[in-house]
UniProtKB/Swiss-Prot annotation:
Species, as recorded: Escherichia coli (strain K12)
Record's protein name: Anaerobic nitric oxide reductase transcription regulator NorR
Pathway entry: Nitrogen metabolism; nitric oxide reduction
Binding-site positions, ATP: 215-222, 278-287
Ranges of residues in domain Sigma-54 factor interaction: 187-416
Induction remarks: By anaerobic conditions, however not induced by NO alone.
A biological-process GO annotation: positive regulation of DNA-templated transcription
Span list, region NO sensor or transducer: 1-186
Matches recorded under CDD domains: AAA (cd00009)
Function comment: Required for the expression of anaerobic nitric oxide (NO) reductase, acts as a transcriptional activator for at least the norVW operon. Activation also requires sigma-54. Not required for induction of the aerobic NO-detoxifying enzyme NO dioxygenase. Binds to the promoter region of norVW, to a consensus target sequence, GT-(N7)-AC, which is highly conserved among proteobacteria.
Amino acid sequence: MSFSVDVLANIAIELQRGIGHQDRFQRLITTLRQVLECDASALLRYDSRQFIPLAIDGLAKDVLGRRFALEGHPRLEAIARAGDVVRFPADSELPDPYDGLIPGQESLKVHACVGLPLFAGQNLIGALTLDGMQPDQFDVFSDEELRLIAALAAGALSNALLIEQLESQNMLPGDATPFEAVKQTQMIGLSPGMTQLKKEIEIVAASDLNVLISGETGTGKELVAKAIHEASPRAVNPLVYLNCAALPESVAESELFGHVKGAFTGAISNRSGKFEMADNGTLFLDEIGELSLALQAKLLRVLQYGDIQRVGDDRCLRVDVRVLAATNRDLREEVLAGRFRADLFHRLSVFPLSVPPLRERGDDVILLAGYFCEQCRLRQGLSRVVLSAGARNLLQHYSFPGNVRELEHAIHRAVVLARATRSGDEVILEAQHFAFPEVTLPTPEVAAVPVVKQNLREATEAFQRETIRQALAQNHHNWAACARMLETDVANLHRLAKRLGLKD
């Protein structure tokens, strides 16, 4: 088999049809999977010796949340080191990173694997991976044909990365190349709430405004603060952290503003406070709502005039500090109750950000679960950690009052429990490994029997059409996987789909 001009043109067209980068990447992966008839495909971005999935097809959804460190994935390391197409033999001793992550094939090992490194000039920027369940699945495609595919994908990814850098309005170091940007915090999530939050972070990071980050406990407010700092012009200077809830009243002023020798009993030397440490950088005040009214007044002065006074010192020191504050309280209610100063609230909340709770983030819970599974795999030296269908269903229907922090602890605990019930270095997390309070899973509703308005043939075709649509959706539009699920020959399925108007 060889690629026709029409096939390559179709791939190029799909790369232009998407509205955003994510849509274009997904179209590319879906089209490649159809053209190459593979069971799974993925587009990965290379960053700091790890591959980050950008788009997948035929793989479990939690793959999008995983971060594949080269040290833990020898096949991906081989792809990163190669300058050309990499074909792994079916009997390769190198474990495949997607073993157990192809829906419906969890118990089988991937047999055919091709890796295409993607370059912008001499810089590795990503990779395309193609996987199949048959050993000789990709033998019909020449290296030259696969290089054409890699060139198209590399061009799309290179343009996307360049546009991303321009849109971020961040200046690179003077000697940096376009693909050597300062590493920034990765915030995992594709839900509308997280997409909006990422846009707002990008907007406010380029400014010097104070930011008030609100959200429930465990939602990741500190991660938001870190992302703002790392995407700001202050990124080369320190981000200093202070938990106001853990600050004893007796030393709170000293912690914030510092003290001079002899200022109080135990002050045996001069000491800089958090504001001095954060000069020209960023100060993150976590749980700002826990500060006393007296300290709030002193903090307000710093925000107004930009100077601090060490405890026991009459002199004022000028500081240039951006303040990011976080709280799990409703500070408006605290102001009305007289527990928080209104003037300080308005100074801090120049640009308010709200971090959505995990229960409102939809499928993000699965992406995050994949991220934590990969972390556990690396830390505990396991060959793979995967979620069963039952575990995924449970995670999607639990409310997570402790949010992302609770999910992280639940995954780590489940891995420990799962390891105790089976030998070997492969772990499959089942629903029973999660010690959640009772979760009511939805039961399929029995549809009312419709009034017959079709003849038998029309009703049969309508049933076949809907069954095929559902099977395609469950298998990410992979016709081969769909045929296996429906227990029919793939060629017969294609013919039936054409007759039913599901294919051109």
